C-alpha cells in the first residue's frame, strides 16, 4: 500500500470505528460508514489497534450510551486528524481527477469527524448546510413531490384504484400495495428470478457500452438473506474477499432484507435493480475489477457512506431500472405497475431528503415530519416512522446521508438525458477513473470538448 492508500485506510476506518462501524462484519448489523474492504491489503492500525474493538462493541459516538473512556483511549492510539491532513496533502500533490476525488473524500470525512466532536462536546455544532454540502456538493433544499404524486394518482386510477374515494390517494396506494405484497417466505426464490431478469436486461443494454474487459465480471454474485428484527429495511453487503484458485476475485455480496418488511412486487423489482443489478452490487464489482487491473486506486476498495461518491452511487442505483431497460424516462418502462413501483420508490427517497430538511433545517418535531412524509410522499406508516425517527433524527445519517438519494437520482437522470449512453455509463461506473457526484462532470465535459 502506498502513502495515499495508508492515509485513506486510516482516515476512513478511523472515522468508521469512531462511529461504531466494523467494515469486516459480513452483516449490515455491524457495518456503518465504510462499505467495503476487498484490497487484500493488511488492515490499518485504525482498525487493529487494541482500543478499536471496544469502541466498535459499544457503538462509538453513535451508541445508545457513549463510552467516553473507550473513545478517548482509541483517539490516543489513532490520530485521525493527522490521517485526514495527510490525505489532503496527497490530494494536492496528485491533482487532476483523482486529486479532486480525494479532496472531496477528505472534506466529507472531516465533516463526519466534526459531527463526532459535536456529540462528545468537544466542538461547535456543525451547520446543517455544511453537512449537506459535504456529501452532495449542494446546499439543502426541500423535495418537490407533486409531479410524481400526480403521476401515481393517474396510473392508479387507470389500474382501478381511484383517489377520488373517501380514503383518497393514500388509500388507493395502500390498496394497490396490499394486492401485490411480496411473501417474505418466498423472497429468496423471488429475488433469484428478479435478479436473473435484470441481469439479462443489463447484458443487453449496459454491457455493450462498457469496456470489453468488464464482460467477464459477474454483475450479481449475491445471496438474498431474510433477517429478523433488524433496524434497517435492507442492507447490501459487498464482501469481495473470496478468491478463485487463480487468485481472481469472486465479486461476492449478500443482501439482507428485513423479514417484517411489507413491499409490493413492483417496488421489489425496483429494489433489486437498485441494490443488485445493475445497481450497487454491479457498481462495486466493476470497481473491484478496475482496481485489480490497476485502473482505479486503493480508494475504490474502501467505499464510504456520507460522501459524494455515495451520492453518485445512490443516484446510479435509483436509475438502474431505467439503465437495465435502455430508457431514460419512467414512462418508457414496459409495464405501468412497474412505473408505479418506481415512482413510489423515488417518492420514498424524496421523503428521505424532506425528513432531513424538516428535521435539521427547520427543527420540526418528529410527529409533524412523519405526517408530512405519509401525506405528501405516500410512504407507509412504518416508513414514515423510521424516516422521521431512527434515520431522520440520527446525528450523522439525518444530516449527511438522507439528502444523498434525491440529489444523486436527479443528477444521474439529467446526465443520462444529456449524454449518450456510450459516454455517460462508462463514466458513472468509474471506467474513466473513480468519480463522485461533483467530479463526474469533469469527465463528461472533457468528452464534449
Write out the residue ranges for each language-model feature.
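N-terminal maturation segment of proteins
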Residues: 1-449
Amino acid at each position: 500500500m502506498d502513502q495515499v492508500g495508508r492515509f485513506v485506510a486510516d482516515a476512513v476506518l478511523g472515522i468508521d470505528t469512531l462511529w461504531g462501524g466494523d467494515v469486516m462484519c459480513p452483516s449490515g448489523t455491524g457495518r456503518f460508514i465504510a462499505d467495503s474492504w476487498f484490497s487484500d491489503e493488511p488492515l490499518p492500525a485504525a482498525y487493529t489497534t487494541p482500543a478499536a474493538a471496544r469502541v466498535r462493541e459499544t457503538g462509538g459516538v453513535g451508541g445508545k450510551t457513549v463510552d467516553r473512556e473507550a473513545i478517548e483511549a482509541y483517539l490516543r492510539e489513532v490520530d485521525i486528524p493527522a490521517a485526514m491532513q495527510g490525505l489532503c496533502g496527497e490530494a494536492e500533490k496528485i491533482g487532476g481527477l483523482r486529486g479532486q476525488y480525494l479532496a472531496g473524500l477528505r472534506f466529507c470525512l472531516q465533516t463526519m469527524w466534526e459531527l463526532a466532536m459535536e456529540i462528545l462536546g468537544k466542538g461547535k455544532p456543525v451547520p446543517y448546510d455544511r453537512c449537506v454540502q459535504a456529501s452532495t456538493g449542494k446546499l439543502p433544499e426541500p423535495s418537490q413531490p407533486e409531479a410524481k404524486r400526480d403521476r401515481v394518482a393517474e396510473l392508479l386510477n387507470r389500474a382501478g384504484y381511484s383517489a377520488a374515494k373517501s380514503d383518497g390517494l393514500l388509500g388507493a396506494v395502500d390498496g394497490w400495495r396490499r394486492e401485490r405484497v411480496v411473501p417474505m417466505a418466498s423472497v429468496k426464490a423471488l429475488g433469484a428470478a428478479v435478479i436473473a431478469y435484470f441481469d439479462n436486461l443489463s447484458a443487453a443494454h449496459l454491457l455493450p457500452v462498457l469496456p470489453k474487459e468488464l464482460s467477464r465480471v459477474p454483475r450479481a454474485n449475491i445471496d438474498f438473506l431474510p433477517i429478523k428484527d433488524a433496524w434497517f429495511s435492507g442492507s447490501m453487503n459487498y464482501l469481495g474477499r473470496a478468491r478463485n484458485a487463480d487468485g481472481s476475485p469472486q465479486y461476492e455480496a449478500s443482501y439482507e432484507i428485513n423479514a417484517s418488511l411489507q413491499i409490493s412486487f413492483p417496488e421489489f423489482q425496483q429494489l433489486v435493480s437498485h441494490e443488485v443489478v445493475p445497481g450497487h452490487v454491479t457498481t462495486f464489482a466493476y470497481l473491484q475489477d478496475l482496481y485489480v487491473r490497476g485502473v482505479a486506486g486503493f480508494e475504490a476498495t474502501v467505499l464510504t457512506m456520507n460522501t459524494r461518491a455515495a451520492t453518485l452511487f445512490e443516484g446510479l442505483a435509483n436509475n438502474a431500472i431505467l439503465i437495465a431497460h435502455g430508457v431514460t424516462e419512467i414512462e418508457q418502462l414496459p409495464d405501468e405497475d412497474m412505473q408505479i413501483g418506481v415512482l413510489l420508490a423515488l417518492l420514498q427517497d424524496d421523503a428521505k431528503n424532506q425528513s432531513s430538511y424538516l428535521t435539521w433545517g427547520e427543527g420540526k418535531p418528529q410527529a409533524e415530519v412523519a405526517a408530512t412524509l405519509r401525506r405528501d410522499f405516500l410512504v407507509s406508516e412504518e416508513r414514515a416512522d423510521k424516516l422521521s425517527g431512527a434515520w431522520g433524527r440520527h446525528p450523522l445519517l439525518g444530516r449527511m446521508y438522507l439528502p444523498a438519494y434525491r440529489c444523486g437520482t436527479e443528477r444521474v437522470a439529467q446526465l443520462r438525458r444529456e449524454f449518450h449512453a456510450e459516454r455517460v455509463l462508462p463514466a458513472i461506473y468509474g471506467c474513466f477513473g473513480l468519480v463522485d457526484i461533483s467530479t463526474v462532470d469533469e469527465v463528461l465535459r472533457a468528452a464534449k470538448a
